[in-house]
């Protein structure tokens, strides 16, 4: 993965508002399709990787960039497990010896973990409610475009379905009355959302708010990941393990 250090302007205000005290560096990662964040507990640094579109038009993708900074804030205030997935040495070895097996298991963990964005967006909404409204509008427009183009394969991807569940959960969690009911939109186009996805939307909606007490919040994270993996019928047994100063994931 090639990346180049960049110095975007105007983001310091968001870092300051979030109270970030660890250095944040920004990197242009042309091969990335979306923005990405890596929080390193050992070096006490944050890296925010910007996709080409985010670098060229930061105002359009500001919700995503600030979202990544909120990941950094949770990493500092709770743990890096809320921003970056790390694995036990056992699974690091599997990644080298059995890359196919690791890739499949790691993807399942990511899908079971990605609702961490609910808590990230709780923090973003507290400071900048207009950004979640912008993000919801953009996401809804994207879904409508997929419908118009009959992109059924993209609509049925796990990432899209979990995004729909999160979108629906946040509509009610944050009282976003102007945010589109995408389940209804899909139904109007003859597409019925699976019960398990609707169930996940309800589950996400009622996720406990973080208390910013690491042990308790990590337990909430772990139990929710276990539950999502169960609902999605993934053959993994995710568990957070404290190793060498880091909370890392073991998959059984």
Enumerate the language-model features and the residues they cover.
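Post-HEXXH active-site segment of zinc metalloproteases
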Residues: 59, 74-112
